[in-house]
């Protein structure tokens, strides 16, 4: 498992600081604790924006009313803060991997979601050989000394730049894809 420090610093509310600390590109974001904070969204971001619950769930907002509606829904369900994140136009990619806690990457499997459920979960995907994604993963593990399994959620923009959207401190539901390409990450943990 990751250390408590690793777990906390990768929280959505800390993602900008995480990106700055480790030299990883992340979308610009803003933490919102109450309705009065929402007036800043239109000043700091171009629409659309992503409105994220602190633990789970997200919506895309194309105007201030949709930001407000998403904020109310997410804060009622998950509490505050709610995170407003720059919307990155592009294609979603993911990496699952395993760090040894000393900076070494034991395993890493990049993938592209091909079929997505109504909840945004991968129903089908393909592994991809992308050296930049693998290097980004090695950098993440090396700089943070990550311990345990993880999933990196990435967005590749139109300029082919990768942005880190989220770090899940667990193996993803699609972990069997890694087994299928010869990296049995669950077995490596035990």
How would you describe each model-predicted region?
Residues 1-3:
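Short beta-strand elements of ligand-binding domains
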Residues 6-90, 100-104, 131-134:
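Active-site nucleotide/adenylate-binding loops and adjacent lid/helix of ATP-dependent enzymes
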Residues 41, 59, 93, 160, ...:
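Active-site-proximal flexible loops/turns
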Residues 56-57, 115-118, 170-173:
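A short, flexible beta-alpha/helix-coil linker loop
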Residues 63-145, 155-163:
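Phosphate-binding site of ATP-dependent enzymes
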Residues 128-153, 158, 169-190:
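Active-site "cap" helix and flanking loop/linker of ATP-utilizing ligase/carboxylase catalytic domains
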Residues 165-167:
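Activation loop entry of protein kinases
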């Amino acid at each position: 498992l990751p250390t408590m420090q690793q777990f906390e610093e990768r929280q959505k509310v800390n993602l900008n600081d995480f990106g700055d600390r480790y030299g990883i590109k992340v979308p610009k974001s803003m933490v919102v604790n109450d309705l009065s904070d929402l007036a800043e969204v239109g000043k700091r971001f171009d629409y659309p924006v992503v409105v994220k619950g602190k633990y789970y769930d997200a919506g895309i907002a194309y105007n201030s009313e949709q930001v407000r509606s998403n904020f109310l829904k997410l804060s009622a369900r998950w509490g505050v803060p709610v995170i407003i994140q720059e919307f990155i136009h592009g294609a979603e990619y993911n990496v699952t991997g395993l760090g040894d806690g000393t900076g070494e990457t034991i395993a890493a499997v990049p993938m592209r979601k091909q079929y997505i459920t109504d909840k945004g979960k991968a129903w089908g995907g393909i592994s991809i050989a992308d050296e930049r994604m693998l290097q980004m993963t090695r950098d993440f593990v090396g700089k943070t000394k990550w311990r345990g399994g993880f999933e990196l959620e990435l967005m590749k923009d139109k300029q082919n730049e990768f942005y880190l959207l989220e770090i899940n401190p667990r193996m993803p539901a699609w972990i069997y894809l890694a087994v299928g390409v010869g990296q049995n990450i669950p077995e490596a943990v035990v």
